[in-house]
Amino acid sequence: MTSSLVGSEMCIRDSFMDPEPEFTRWAKETGADRIELYTEGYAAAYGTALEDDILQPYVDSALLCDELALGVNAGHDLSLDNLEKLLTACGNIQEVSIGHALTVEALQFGFAETIRRYNELLDRVAAKPRVFPQE
């Protein structure tokens, strides 16, 4: 887990972490405004039989953030393929980091088309009810 906890009116304090409840609670105790969920595990499991089991801790972390009044960001290996399910399941994600996938998708589809596809995906997610799958 890494943390950037520099407080000021112009700086959001966040902690980059795995979806572990104790890390989320620690972030709140140290004064973070948000957490950023490290999504490599979810991205690696996407499209496999483990997908839903791996997704559940992210959902649980998002729910805990609601309880603790923490914002939620997410990032690492997110793409057009896997982003919609994550955003739908964790309805309170405020920001995502799309890095390498955006470059690869832009080479594949063109930059304008890739951005259009992300905007379309975000519109679909915004039109859905907030869903937090529970066991």
Stretches with model-predicted labels:
Residues 16, 54, 75-76, 107:
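Glycine- and other small-residue-rich loops at beta-strand/loop junctions that grip anionic moieties
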Residues 23, 54-61, 82-86, 114-118:
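A general structural detector for well-ordered alpha-helical segments in enzyme core domains, enriched
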Residues 14-65:
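Histidine/lysine/aspartate-rich catalytic loop segments that bind and position anionic ligands
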Residues 35-46, 92-111:
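Glycine-rich phosphate-binding active-site loops on the catalytic face of alpha/beta enzymes
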Residues 12-16, 33-36, 71-73, 93-97:
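Structural preference for beta-strand elements that scaffold enzyme active sites
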Residues 1-7, 11-12:
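Single conserved hydrophobic/aromatic residue that forms the stacking wall/gate
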Residues 47, 51, 105-128:
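C-terminal helical cap(s) of enzyme catalytic domains, especially alpha/beta-barrels
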Residues 20-30, 78-93:
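Catalytic cores of alpha/beta
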